[in-house]
Amino acid sequence: MARHSVQIQTAVLATVLTIGGSVVGLAQSSQTKGDTYTWNGELVSLDTTAKTITVKSRVAYQEAISELKHFKAGDRVWIVWSGMHDFSDAVRQIRRAETGGKIDENLVLPAELVSTEAPNQSLTIRVTVPENALAAIKTVKPGEWVTVTSRHRPSTQDDAVVAVRPYAATTTTE
């Protein structure tokens, strides 16, 4: 009888560990997805040597457009995106990068300001991208759109962008 009880306890423990391990695995994979967000922009240029892309994005708010005059090409900036936790389609605010500062908000991207176009409600930024992102967009031509996946609260500018891919509307298969 005691042997049977030990076998049942062992089976229950194995089941709990299996289910618990699966739940932890799911939590980790969803946490990874939750650590990033996507945004879209028009590809201006790609520099494979410097591992950077230059992208034009829309500025959503009049206050942000008014602030553009305080920045110049080459400034290190923090782009604050408008949107939900995992997606943005426009810039909400532009800030001067804090030297040695740590980004402690979601939807904030460190970048180099390339140009501003207040009348067109857009700005152009340059960001560092990982090697695999360069390969993923090598066929994208300037003027075409890309989807960029960025990390929430990146520790450095070099790890802010996780991936880049050609922008594509959702398609259905029949």
Language-model regions: role of each:
Residues 2-174:
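Short, flexible, surface-exposed loop segments at domain boundaries
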